[in-house]
Amino acid sequence: FQDNKLLGDRSAYENVALPLIINGTGEREIGRRVRAALDQVGLLDRERYPPRALSAGEQQRLGIARAIVSRPKVLIADEPTGNLDPDLALEVMGLFKRLNEVGTTMLVATHDLHLVERFGSRRIVLAGGQVEGGAGVQAA
């Protein structure tokens, strides 16, 4: 999520719908799932806005909505809370935790050790590209 690759000429709704359109999902299902994803990240009231009209934090959450709308089995998030204020960061990590609880494997790369301690069930510490340690992981 460091670079969301949002489509600037499309609305928030259209940005989130894109993976479902590509997969051939029906229009009614697209509408239901896109609105649910936007609601989960607190952007339902911004569905008609283009990304340029959103704050950096809102753009970050829009990218997250697009990532979760297709209900992936595995979600890899690189600094997903980087542009968010602390309260929103907690909300996003809470969303990730709920996704994990219903079967989505989450891999979150972050420098925010507080979030790791609060939400991570397992962690791996990397230093200089090498595994340095972590819960349940042998140091390299």
Named regions from a protein language model:
Residues P50-L54, E58-Q60:
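Conserved ABC ATPase signature
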Residues R10-A17:
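Short coil-to-helix segment of the ABC ATPase nucleotide-binding domain corresponding to the Q-loop/switch region
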Residues E29-V41:
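ABC nucleotide-binding domain "signature" region
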Residues L75-D78:
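Catalytic Walker B motif of ABC-type/P-loop ATPase nucleotide-binding domains
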Residues P86-L88:
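Helix N-cap at the start of a conserved alpha-helix in ABC-type nucleotide-binding domains
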Residues Y49, S70, V102:
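Conserved signature/switch motifs of ABC ATPase nucleotide-binding domains
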Residues I64:
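Hydrophobic anchor residue at the start of the ABC signature
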